UniProtKB/Swiss-Prot annotation:
The gene is RPL14. CDD domains: Ribosomal_uL14 (cd00337). Keywords: Mitochondrion, Ribonucleoprotein, Ribosomal protein. It comes from Paramecium tetraurelia. It is found in: Mitochondrion. This is Large ribosomal subunit protein uL14m.
């Protein structure tokens, strides 16, 4: 579960390592973001050759979080870290490819990028 001021890793090839959450697009009373939710982030750490500077604001989508999730078939999935993908537009990722497994519920959000794995 992602709240405001949560730091997340980035799993695409946009040369950004760490971002900080400051807004969750979920509704007025919802303070916690879950898998597949859109968030607004600020860039905290980048590679030296990156064109995106520290402090810039971007939109992102949550693709993994450390809080466990019970699936409909009864299995339990849990990731080791909180991870997001930076977005250019509402559905276009900033990097060319996405690294690591992605939760299958993100595909239901009509996210047009092809994902490497399914969990």
């Amino acid at each position: 579960m992602i709240q405001k001021e949560t730091q997340l890793n980035v799993c695409d090839t946009s040369s950004v390592w760490v971002v900080n959450t400051f807004h969750i697009y979920r509704g007025f009373r919802h303070r916690i973001g879950r898998l597949g939710d859109y968030i607004k982030v600020s860039i905290r750490s980048t590679k030296p050759e990156c064109t995106i500077k520290r402090g810039k604001k971007k939109k992102a989508i949550i693709v993994r979080h450390a809080f466990g999730r019970l699936k409909r078939d009864g299995s339990f999935s849990k990731f080791s870290s909180n991870v997001c993908v930076l977005l250019k537009k509402r559905t276009a990722p900033l990097g060319r490819e996405i690294k690591g497994p992605i939760f299958y519920g993100v595909k239901k959000k009509k996210f047009v990028a092809s994902f490497p794995g399914r969990v």
